Amino acid sequence: MTRQDIIDELESRGFDDTIFLDDPSFEDAIIGITEDGHLIYNYDSMVNNLVDNYTKEGLNEDEAYTSAIEWISYNTIRAIPYMKSYGKEPIIAYSFNT
């Protein structure tokens, strides 16, 4: 689904205050939506998408993986609690093996 497809689906369900994560590489990590309109992102997919971007930029696999985890932890996960005042903050789903 494209971002616009997701927006259209959200609007059809009456959710106009759902917050998307800004990084476009995270759009492929959207795995669903809660009953009350929170987008659900898969953490492993978020990491893998950033690793792909970083390796294309020249980092080796280990550096890219470490950088991706650090970036998501610092710039995304830390920010989620502050998003609540702007709308329905995203939820990050973790695999059991993470």
Give a label for each model feature.
Residues 1-98:
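C-terminal alpha-helical interaction appendages
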